[in-house]
Structures are given as C-alpha cells and as structure tokens.
C-alpha cells in the first residue's frame, strides 16, 4: 500500500512581487499544475491516500478560482483519498466547498482514518489545544501509526510548534509534518521518524534545491522515499570572478562555472575581488546571461581591491573617503574593506546590498 505525504503547496500565493509579470504568471500556473500532476501520479501509481499537512492555500480566504481548482482536482481523482489538515496560512477557510467522499478533514480534536494496517491520525493546532494535544494522543503499539501535524519542531509546546520530546514513546511510526518548505527528516524515537515533505514548487530564492513529496510504502513497516516533483528547480550559486574588468567578462566566467538547465531559475552571486574602478556588474551580467535559463538573477557581491597609495593625492570626495577610512586605527582590515566597498558604491550611485 502507498501513501503520499505532501504539504505547503500555497495555492494562490503572491509570486508577482518576486519576478517580472510574465515569469510570475507562469510560476503561479505551475504551482496549480503541479498539484494536478500529483493527483494524477497518485491515481496512476496505486496510491490510496494523499496526506496534505497544511498550507494547501496561501490565505485563510482563498480566491474562488483557487478553491474551485483544488476541489475539481480531488473530485476528478475518485480513487484516491485526500486528507487535508489545515496549517497556519489556511487555518480558517480552506474547508469551505462541496462535499466529496474522498476528501477527509481534521479539526481541533484528534481525528483518525484507517487504511488496512495503518491508521492516520491528525489534529489542527490552536492556542487552545497546543499544549493538551500531546496528552490526549494515545496510539496502540500493535499497528502502524502515522500522525499529521503542522508546525515548527521545537523544545516546548505552543501554537504552530511541534514538541518532539512530548511525542516520543507514543507508538508513532511516521510523523508527517508541514510548515518547513525544505524537505528534511529526523529520528523521533527508537520506533519512529519525523519528516517534512517540503513544498511542491519552489517560489523564491529562499526555496532553492529539489522540491517534491514523500512516498510512503507500507507493508509490515513503513519505508519512505523523497520524490523530486517540481516543474523547475531554483538554484543558487556563488561564482568567483576575481580580476574581471566588467560585467561581460563576469558573465563569461559564470557560463564557464555553471552548467545551466534551460528550465530552471538561478540566483548567481558574483564573489571575489575586482579592481576598484569596476562598476556594479549585477544588472548588466543578468542581460548577458538572460538566454542561459528560464530566469536569472545576478547579485554583485564582489569586493573592490583598493590601493591606498593610488588615492594619496586624489582631491575628489572619493579620495578623501578612502584616506579617512584607512586612517581610522579603530577599524580592522576587514571592516575597512566592507566600509570602502559600500562607500565607493554609494559615491558612484550604485545599489548597496
């Protein structure tokens, strides 16, 4: 028997502010399409249930078109149950919709669904039950037990916090969590593990790397496999461009260092040391690299090589600034470099990060 653990789909999220309009529109569409593909995968691969561990929607009050889409996907996948436990983003309005026999929900008390020799039990956290939910969880040890929660693992109980130490010794085989967008797992106790499936699609440069879901294979015990499933991958790389004289040379160094995939999104950080007279390279390097992939963002994080002697007789404001920084004995060499980097960019009218 197979069960899918997924979470943090964030249908209807505001991607618009992160990218140009045409890119954000395509990514918004792909977030929806990936959920549709997930349902299709489940139906075609004999999956009996999909566990949605919170934040299916990005808002407590989803747009009608987003809710209609979600329920239509479930209605069109009748062979698969969808167990939806609301998270901190969709804690109020996600359940409003049509009644579907394969759509299962949770609430402020523990609720259980049984599939063969495994039981799935979940509860939606609130300020009222955040502490008491641990003492009310009782699971038999002679069957397989999956528990669903949404929150950040923590040492103490609280709203949107999952206190792992209070779940130990509870006969949990697999703790299916939502809230953290990066896939991760760990040992809960001698019997069970906990896991975050992560989000299905990365949406910003804080969500780099593979994204997908966890496939649970259930026999006498539960085994799990992470399945990369996103339409695209968001990649962040540092590229050393020391010594380059301009943005074009930097872009050539990037092409040599990075094996671009045309379908992916990239954040390239230019690092290293370049001559003091080299201007800000990020924006121009983006233009030179625009054809390398689906979307690219380039940040110039290089240091400027400052020769103090070259500014000894410079009568400009820049010269005065450099001499003043080097004369300050209270600053370390690293502090001087950072101040000069930011100050020279500011004097040149460039963006400071």
What are these regions (language model features)?
Residues 1-22, 211, 218-237:
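Domain-start "cap" segments at the beginnings of catalytic or binding domains
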Residues 23, 49, 58-195, 199-204, ...:
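His/Asp/Glu-rich metal-coordinating catalytic cores
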Residues 37-45, 72-73, 136, 256-257:
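A generic secondary-structure signal
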Residues 47, 79, 142-144, 172, ...:
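A general structural motif
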Residues 220-353:
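Accessory, non-catalytic peripheral segments of nucleic-acid enzymes
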């Amino acid at each position: 028997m197979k069960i899918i653990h997924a979470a943090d789909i964030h249908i209807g999220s505001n991607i618009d502010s992160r990218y140009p309009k045409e890119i954000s529109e395509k990514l918004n569409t792909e977030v929806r399409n990936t959920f549709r593909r997930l349902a299709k995968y489940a139906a075609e691969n004999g999956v009996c249930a999909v566990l949605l561990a919170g934040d299916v929607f990005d808002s407590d009050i989803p747009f009608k078109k987003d809710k209609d889409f979600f329920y239509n996907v479930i209605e069109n996948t009748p062979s698969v149950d969808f167990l939806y436990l609301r998270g901190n983003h969709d804690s109020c309005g996600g359940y409003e919709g049509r009644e579907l026999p394969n759509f299962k929900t949770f609430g402020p008390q523990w609720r259980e669904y049984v599939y063969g020799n495994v039981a799935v039990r979940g509860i939606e956290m609130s300020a009222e039950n955040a502490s008491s939910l641990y003492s009310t969880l009782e699971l038999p040890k002679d069957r397989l037990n999956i528990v669903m929660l949404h929150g950040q693992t923590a040492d103490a109980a609280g709203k949107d916090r999952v206190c792992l130490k209070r779940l130990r010794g509870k006969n949990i085989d697999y703790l299916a969590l939502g809230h953290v967008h990066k896939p991760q797992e760990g040992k809960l106790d001698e019997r069970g593990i906990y896991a975050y499936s992560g989000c299905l699609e990365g949406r910003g440069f804080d969500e780099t790397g593979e994204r997908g879901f966890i496939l649970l294979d259930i026999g006498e015990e539960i085994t799990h496999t992470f399945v990369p499933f996103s339409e695209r991958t968001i990649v962040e790389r540092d590229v050393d461009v020391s010594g380059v004289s301009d943005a074009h040379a930097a872009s050539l160094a990037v092409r040599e260092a990075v094996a671009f995939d045309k379908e992916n999104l990239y954040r390239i950080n230019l690092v290293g040391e370049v001559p003091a007279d080299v201007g800000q390279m990020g924006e121009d390097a983006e233009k030179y690299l625009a054809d390398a992939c689906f979307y690219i963002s380039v940040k110039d994080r290089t240091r400027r090589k400052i020769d103090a002697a070259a500014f000894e007789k410079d009568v400009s404001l820049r010269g005065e600034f450099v001499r003043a920084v080097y004369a300050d004995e209270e600053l370390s060499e690293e502090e001087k470099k950072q101040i000069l980097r930011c100050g020279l960019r500011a004097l040149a009218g460039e963006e400071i990060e």
